[in-house]
Amino acid sequence: MSIKYVATSKLPTPWGVFAMHGFEDTETGKEHVALTFGTLSADEPVLGRIHSECLTGDALFSLRCDCGFQLQTAMQNIAETGCGFILYLRQEGRGIGLLNKIRAYELQDKGANTVEANEQLGFPADMRKYDMIKPMLEQIGVKHVRLMTNNPRKVKAMKEFGIEVVERVPLQVGKNRYNEAYLKTKSTELGHMMSEYHFVDED
């Protein structure tokens, strides 16, 4: 496995002080991060999330997606629970990279949905891989997970790498008029598990 643990530091946040663990993929050069909060147990289910990097949503407050809302809600939920983790994976734009993501956004501005835009650029709908999660979870000592996600591929990936997903915790937040079509596409074409009320316009 090409994932190498590098270092751990404190990360003060609005929800409390997390620990930030740095990892390097020596084959690709990508750097990944695990955030942990509280004392994690290898014997008990731990609340956690696998979160793929989204510069526009996580850092630039974009309303085109639900990523930033999901990240903040996951961190808040973990802090309120008292312990948990987030694996922050550097897989921008479902794996196509930032500049290609901007190209995909340009196509979406012209009418394509998020899947069509990727395909028009010559990419699959979702290029993300999850082989790095096993060594990262081994480093932070987690074997059983209550996974915050709407994406069945993440549940499947954890199970394939021998991580027990005790419960899938839905994370349906951040719906707005700019991302409603995007969320519907994630549900209908990418298989994300979202309830109908998530798409009802709010007054």
From Swiss-Prot:
Gene name in the database record: ribA
CC terms in the record's Gene Ontology section: cytosol
Family annotation (PANTHER family): 3,4-DIHYDROXY-2-BUTANONE 4-PHOSPHATE SYNTHASE, GTP CYCLOHYDROLASE II-RELATED
InterPro entries: GTP_cyclohydro_II (IPR032677), RibA (IPR000926), RibA-like_sf (IPR036144)
Functional pathway: Cofactor biosynthesis; riboflavin biosynthesis; 5-amino-6-(D-ribitylamino)uracil from GTP: step 1/4
Residues that, per the record, bind Zn(2+): 54, 65, 67
UniProt name for this protein: GTP cyclohydrolase-2
GO molecular-function term, one example from the UniProt record: zinc ion binding
Cofactor: Zn(2+)
Positions of the catalytic residues: 126 (proton acceptor), 128 (nucleophile)
Residues engaged in binding GTP: 49-53, 70, 92-94, 114, 149, 154
Family note: Belongs to the GTP cyclohydrolase II family.
